[in-house]
């Protein structure tokens, strides 16, 4: 169990997934889980680890099938969530989702050979609607692609949340153009980064996280488990993600900001 020096305030897990085996998959999905991880499974996992609140991240294998996530948000008020949407979605749909507890849109651009052009009218209209709702854009993309896409996203005025430490390019890491572009975006005041996904980033992940905390500060960082660790379920546990955070952020006061203060303001205020 986590130490009381960490969990002495409400803890927010900023990135989890839920899904069921009967949900329709997109063609050629990145992952194809053969099991369900329901909202109830998630709640039980959170409770076992003393975590109060969580944010469901829309997952690319199910594309814009958001029905189960939205229904779960309506049922469980301790959850918030992001969805995957086409940029042509109407405002009335966004309003209905907002009432359910949706607070953002995920752009799952990772492993996408042709990243969508977010400067088109459809995307600019879409991003303006998200900004008007005070939602955030939650982007998952390779670090080396951040310098090209961040300016257009920032110009829209929408809040940005970048997944998994910005996924720095492994060889250059914190010295890469992508990592520097992410830090510059954070400095401009509308961007946050998730301290998450270390198990997906190799042995350098702790170094990336420590440098991010040092450069960005805990006021712009949120912790996340990435539960249930799709594709790595046999090798990663929830407790290990907590232990990784403790190792990366040894200062208890800084950890409290990353697991409580910052995500509460960003997701639940």
Language-model segment annotations:
Residues 63-144, 187, 192, 197-198:
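Active-site gating/metal-coordination segments in enzymes
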Residues 119-223:
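Catalytic pocket-lining loop regions of alpha/beta-barrel enzymes
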Residues 29-75, 95:
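Alpha-helical scaffold segments that flank or form the walls of functional sites
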Residues 41-45, 65-72, 93-97, 122-129, ...:
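A general structural detector for well-ordered alpha-helical segments in enzyme core domains, enriched
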Residues 1-12, 35-53, 217-219, 234-269:
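Mid-to-C-terminal alpha-helical segments outside catalytic/metal-binding sites
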Residues 19-21, 61-64, 88-89, 112-113, ...:
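Active-site environment of divalent metal-dependent phosphoester hydrolases
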Residues 12-16, 54-57, 80-83, 103-107, ...:
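Hydrophobic faces of well-ordered beta-strands that scaffold small-molecule active sites
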Residues 15, 46, 69, 97, ...:
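Conserved, mostly hydrophobic/aromatic
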């Amino acid at each position: 169990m986590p130490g009381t020096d960490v969990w002495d305030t409400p803890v927010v897990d900023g990135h989890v997934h839920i899904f069921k085996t009967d949900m329709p998959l997109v063609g050629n999905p990145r992952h194809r889980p053969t099991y369900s991880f329901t909202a109830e499974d998630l709640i039980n996992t959170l409770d076992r680890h003393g975590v109060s609140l969580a944010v469901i991240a829309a997952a690319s294998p199910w594309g814009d099938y958001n029905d189960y996530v939205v229904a779960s948000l309506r049922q469980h008020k301790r959850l918030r969530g992001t969805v995957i949407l086409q940029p042509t979605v109407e405002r009335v749909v966004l309003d209905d989702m907002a009432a359910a507890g949706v607070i953002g849109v995920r752009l799952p651009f990772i492993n996408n050979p042709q990243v969508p052009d977010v400067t088109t009218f459809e995307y600019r209209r879409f991003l303006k609607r998200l900004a008007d709702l005070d939602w955030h854009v939650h982007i998952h993309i390779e670090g080396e692609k951040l310098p090209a896409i961040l300016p257009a996203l920032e110009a829209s005025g929408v809040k940005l949340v970048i997944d998994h430490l910005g996924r720095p390019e492994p060889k250059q890491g914190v010295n890469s153009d992508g990592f520097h572009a992410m830090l510059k975006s954070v400095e401009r005041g509308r961007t946050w980064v998730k301290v998450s996904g270390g198990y997906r980033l190799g042995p350098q992940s702790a170094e990336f996280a420590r440098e991010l905390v040092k450069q960005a500060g805990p006021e712009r960082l949120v912790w996340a488990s990435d539960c249930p660790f799709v594709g790595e379920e046999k090798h990663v546990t929830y407790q290990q993600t907590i232990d990784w955070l403790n190792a990366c952020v040894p200062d208890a006061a800084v950890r409290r900001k990353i697991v409580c203060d910052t995500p509460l303001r960003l997701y639940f205020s």
